Curated annotation (Swiss-Prot):
Residues bearing PTM N6-acetyllysine: K609
Cofactor: Mg(2+)
Biological source species: Citrobacter koseri (strain ATCC BAA-895 / CDC 4225-83 / SGSC4696)
Full protein name: Acetyl-coenzyme A synthetase
Protein family: Belongs to the ATP-dependent AMP-binding enzyme family.
Record EC number: 6.2.1.1
NCBIfam families: Ac_CoA_lig_AcsA, PRK00174.1
Residues at which Mg(2+) binds: V537, H539, I542
Length: 652
């Protein structure tokens, strides 16, 4: 970008921060040079039944990828998230639930959550679920989803949470792969005023002849909508939990016992069941939550992610609850029924830390000041961003409009497979640059390598790898360790390959440039699609953009840009020329888009990620096999884009 914005650490943060710049340097050096000492100390953030003596036992060696942390220690995750807080903070609010309908909200104390989790843990045992069994959870954003997850952890069952937006086919595939014995769902979900037929989707999934492991379906009554009922298989949540005792002793788990499976889409083939274990994962989720959000006991914390994604696991539930925090769970969407809904929720609950995604920020940005109308957001002190690289323009808007120019923005880079934050600012220790994830978290050793795996020193760019293990790292892919090794450790030997590219600037700050397959090669020059998208979105009339490469006879690849304009703006030949020149000015002639495709909407998954694979195929005119579109929030978008494409003159 033509300009680097730099933000100093605000005085109000510096005065009471947990980690200042000097402490960051000292702790980071210790975490790299003496990982056993550092993580041995950090492990004390949890209560252990049998204290660990071993800390780190890991290998990234070809043919021998093995990751173990705290392997001789025992603990229980639910006891760390609930029981240990009861004596001093039992009446503290654990979960604030804000419904899709703004008139519905409730506060659940640690004591109440503990009671419900114990009762549901006993329910699971009565249904024959035991330590090591897999339970599929396909729930809306309601407190019972958290109860189900914590109850599984309490008895040692492995949960596999499936995002409530996934299709019956996707649900069936995940149940089959994990051999889930029980499904927990609701009659319906509610989102932006619309019902989501969760129970019907489960019924359809269970009709798949390859689903033969499921014994029962527990159904929460969320809306009271009509559902089909399978006597003997289906059970109402309220019926089973009412009969269960609130007295339950948590199961003693080894640190390396499986905690959950979370499916993430592979670049090829079927989804991968990423497996996380108990001890190292929770140490990492709690430590990263505490330091990255500079958590203080009076904070009200809101992570907007769904429980169906890893962000919902680590930073809506487990990290905050392990630290005894108050976490807000929101059933709705940030811009419904009004563009100011997110800001209204902040004011209503006096939220101090807000963690959301660039896709939400850009949607609000397109609404302009309507996104903050009638709100003051004065309670906020820290903002966070997750899910994809945030373009500097959206970062600045978020900082300025949502945070009133006083809240540091922690732009966190991490993945389902990492369990927690990897590259991220710390509010009291890091000067910020809009669009940069900045520096590695404690114990994280990033490197940039070329395509042959040679490390690149200094200010440079390359493939982002991690050269040594950290406690939150996924241990394997469920039932397929060979694929785990193949996917993450075979491209570059003795290193974990993230699949992302990044550049490092003169200050050692990292800038994520997007997936490596989202890098264009135009006339022999590498261009990150994120960089071009950022330039496009910095245009005052553009709300969102997605850039892909298309084959070009001379340049190798040409640049094809899908562009969504702000409300009230219309495409015109003049604007077409203006936008192309704008990018040329921002980045250089090489980055000038060859094609602008005006469109009202882009194909997105329900978590807000743009499906670039589909955009690449549409742009290239290759519509023979668009692959699985079941995870799209609105599959109709694809048809519309194909129609629009017909009218576009393509470069030769």
């Amino acid at each position: 970008m033509s300009q680097i914005h730099k933000h100093a650490i605000p005085a109000n943060i510096a005065d009471r921060c947990l980690i200042n710049p000097e402490q960051y340097e000292a702790k980071y050096q210790q975490s790299i040079n003496e990982p056993d000492t550092f993580w041995g100390e950090q492990g004390k953030i949890l209560d252990w039944i049998t204290p660990y003596k071993k800390v780190k036992n890991t290998s990234f060696a070809p043919g021998n990828v093995s990751i173990k942390w705290y392997e001789d220690g025992t603990l229980n995750l639910a006891a760390n998230c609930l029981d240990r807080h009861l004596q001093e903070n039992g009446d503290r609010t654990a979960i604030i639930w804000e419904g899709d309908d703004a008139t519905q909200s409730k506060h659940i104390s640690y004591r109440e959550l503990h009671r419900d989790v114990c009762r549901f843990a006993n329910t699971l045992l009565e249904l024959g679920i035991k330590k090591g069994d897999v339970v599929a959870i396909y729930m809306p954003m309601v407190p019972e989803a958290a109860v189900a997850m914590l109850a599984c952890a309490r008895i040692g069952a492995v949960h596999s949470v499936i995002f409530g937006g996934f299709s019956p086919e996707a649900v069936a595939g995940r149940i089959i792969d994990s051999s889930s014995r029980l499904v927990i769902t609701a009659d319906e979900g509610v989102r932006a005023g619309r019902g989501i037929p969760l129970k019907k989707n489960v019924d359809d999934a269970l009709k798949n002849p390859n689903v033969n492991s499921v014994e029962h379906v527990v159904v929460l009554k969320r809306t009271g909508g009509k559902v089909d009922w399978h006597e003997g298989r289906d059970l109402w949540w309220s019926d089973v939990i009412e009969k269960s005792s609130a007295d339950h002793q948590p199961e003693e788990m080894n640190a390396e016992d499986p905690l959950f499976i979370l499916y993430t889409s592979g670049s090829t083939g079927k989804p991968k069941g990423v497996l996380h274990t108990t001890g190292g994962y929770l140490v990492y989720a709690a430590t990263t939550f505490k330091y990255v959000f500079d958590y203080h006991p009076d904070d009200i914390y809101w992570c907007t992610a769904d429980v169906g994604w890893v962000t919902g696991h680590s930073y809506l539930l487990y990290g905050p609850l392990a630290c005894g925090a108050t976490t807000l769970m929101f059933e709705g969407v940030p811009n419904w029924p009004t563009p100011a809904r997110m800001a209204q929720v902040v004011d209503k609950h006096q939220v101090t830390i807000l963690y959301t995604a660039p896709t939400a920020i850009r949607a609000l940005m397109a609404e302009g000041d309507k996104a903050i109308e009638g709100t003051d957001r004065s309670s906020l002190r820290i903002l966070g961003s997750v899910g994809e690289p945030i373009n500097p323009e959206a970062w600045e808007w978020y900082w300025k409009k949502i945070g009133n120019e006083k809240c540091p923005v922690v732009d966190t880079w991490w993945q389902t497979e990492t369990g927690g934050f990897m590259i991220t600012p710390l509010p009291g220790a890091t000067e910020l640059k809009a669009g940069s994830a900045t520096r590695p978290f404690f114990g994280v050793q990033p490197a940039l390598v070329d395509n042959e795996g040679h490390p690149q020193e200094g200010a440079t760019e390359g493939n982002l790898v991690i050269t040594d293990s950290w406690p939150g790292q996924a241990r394997t892919l469920f039932g397929d360790h060979e694929r785990f090794e193949q996917t993450y450790f075979s491209t570059f030997k003795n290193m974990y390959f993230s699949g992302d590219g990044a550049r490092r600037d003169e200050d050692g700050y990292y800038w994520i440039t997007g997936r490596v397959d989202d890098v264009l090669n135009v006339s022999g020059h590498r261009l990150g699609t994120a960089e071009i998208e950022s330039a496009l979105v910095s245009h005052p009339k553009i709300a969102e953009a997605a850039v892909v490469g298309i084959p070009h006879n001379i340049k190798g690849q040409a640049i094809y840009a899908y562009v969504t304009l702000n409300h009230g703006e219309d495409p015109s030949p003049e604007l077409y020329t203006e936008v192309r020149n704008w990018v040329r000015k921002e980045i250089g002639p090489l980055a000038t888009p060859d094609v602008l495709h005006w469109t009202d909407s882009l194909p997105k998954t329900r978590s807000g990620k743009i499906m670039r694979r589909i955009l690449r195929k549409i742009a290239a005119g290759d519509t023979s096999n668009l692959g699985d579109t079941s995870t799209l929030a609105d599959p109709g978008v694809v048809e519309k884009l194909l129609e629009e494409k017909q009218a576009i003159a393509m470069p030769s």
